[in-house]
C-alpha cells in the first residue's frame, strides 16, 4: 500500500476532534468533535465537525498568520515553514516507530503521521537557542547542448553558523534540520504514472557537506551525483545519509523534503555548505514540449537548535549576515 515512491501524505497533523470506538469499529461522536458555526442558520447557529475538514481549516489559518506577518513570503516558503516547525509527539513515536530502522519503523511513522504537529510560534519566530534561515531561490535545471539535453544548474549556499559558539558547546546536543520545498508541473496525460521521471516536471534534492570534505570536493561530488542520474550512477563519495534521521530513501519523494541530524555541537562546526540540485523530470525527457529551459523556484530552510536555553546562537548569526548583506 505504501509504495516508497509516492509523496508523504499527510504532511502535517492538526487537532480535529476524536472518534469513538467499540473496539471493532469507530464513528463520529459530537461530544468528542469540535464546535463550529452551522450552515443551517434558521434552525441552529452551532454544530460540530471533525476529521480532515477542521484540520484543513486550522492549517489554512496558520498559513494565513505566516502571510500576515511576512506578506512577501513565497507559497513554497509557507508550506516549508509549516512542515519545518512540525514534530512528533512521544505517543506517535511510541505507537508507530516500533522498529528504529529507517526502512521500516521510521517509514511507518512518516507515512502515518507525516512530519508531526506544526508549531505556529516556531514557524513565525527564531529564539536565541533555535535559529532558522530561509533561502528563496531559483535555478534552471536543464539545458539543450547540441542535439542532447543535459542537467544545467545547482545552487551552493554558505550557512552562517557561529563556529566559535558551537565549538564552545563541545559535546552539547544540537539539531540541524533542513526542509526543501518547491512546486512541480505535473506531466500531461497518463504517461506520467508509469515512470517516476515522467510525472514531475523536475525534482530537487539537497545535500550537506561532510565534516571531512572540502568545498571543492563537495561541489564535485554533488555535480557527479546530479549528472549521474542519467545512468543511475551517483558518483564517488558519500552523502553521509546515515547521519540523517529519515535518510534519502524516505525523504526524497514528492516535492517537499525534510530531515534532521542530531549531533554534538562541535561536529556541526564545519557543516557550512549546502547544495540544492535537480534530478530528471519530464521537462528534460519530453523535450519536444519545449519546457527544457524553464526555471523552478524553491524555498530552503535550514535551522540549528539546542535544548540549552542559556545559549545565544541567534546574535552571532544575525551579526554575520549583516556584514554580508549591504544596507541602503
Feature annotation, model-predicted:
Residues 55-69:
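Short, small-residue alpha-helix embedded
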Amino acid at each position: 500500500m505504501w509504495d516508497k515512491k509516492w509523496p508523504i501524505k499527510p504532511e502535517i497533523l492538526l487537532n480535529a476532534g476524536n472518534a469513538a470506538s467499540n473496539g471493532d469499529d469507530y464513528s463520529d461522536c459530537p461530544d468528542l468533535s469540535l464546535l463550529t458555526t452551522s450552515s443551517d442558520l434558521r434552525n441552529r447557529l452551532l454544530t460540530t465537525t471533525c476529521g480532515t475538514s477542521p484540520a484543513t481549516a486550522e492549517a489554512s489559518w496558520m498559513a494565513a498568520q505566516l502571510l500576515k506577518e511576512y506578506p512577501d513570503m513565497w507559497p513554497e516558503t509557507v508550506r516549508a515553514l509549516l512542515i519545518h516547525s512540525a514534530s512528533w509527539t512521544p505517543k506517535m513515536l511510541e505507537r508507530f516507530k516500533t522498529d528504529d530502522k529507517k526502512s521500516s519503523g521510521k517509514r511507518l511513522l512518516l507515512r502515518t503521521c507525516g512530519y508531526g504537529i506544526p508549531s505556529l510560534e516556531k514557524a513565525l519566530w527564531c529564539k536565541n537557542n533555535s535559529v532558522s534561515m530561509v533561502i528563496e531561490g531559483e535555478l534552471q535545471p536543464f539545458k539543450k547542448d547540441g542535439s542532447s539535453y543535459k542537467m544545467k544548474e545547482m545552487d551552493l549556499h554558505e550557512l552562517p553558523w557561529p563556529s566559535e559558539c558551537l565549538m564552545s558547546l563541545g559535546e552539547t546536543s544540537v539539531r540541524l534540520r533542513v526542509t526543501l520545498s518547491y512546486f512541480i508541473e505535473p506531466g500531461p496525460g497518463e504517461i506520467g504514472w508509469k515512470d517516476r521521471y515522467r510525472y514531475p516536471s523536475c525534482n530537487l534534492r539537497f545535500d550537506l557537506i561532510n565534516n571531512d570534505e572540502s568545498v571543492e570536493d563537495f561541489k564535485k561530488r554533488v555535480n557527479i551525483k546530479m549528472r549521474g542520474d542519467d545512468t543511475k550512477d551517483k558518483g564517488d563519495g558519500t552523502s553521509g545519509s546515515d547521519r540523517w534521521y529519515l535518510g534519502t530513501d524516505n525523504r526524497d519523494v514528492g516535492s517537499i523534503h525534510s530531515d534532521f541530524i542530531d549531533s554534538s555541537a562541535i561536529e556541526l562546526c564545519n557543516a557550512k555548505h549546502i547544495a540544492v540540485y535537480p534530478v530528471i523530470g519530464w521537462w528534460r525527457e519530453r523535450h519536444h514540449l519545449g519546457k527544457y529551459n524553464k526555471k523552478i523556484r524553491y524555498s530552503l530552510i535550514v535551522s540549528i537548535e539546542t535544548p540549552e536555553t542559556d545559549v545565544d546562537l541567534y546574535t552571532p548569526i544575525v551579526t554575520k549576515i549583516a556584514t554580508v548583506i549591504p544596507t541602503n
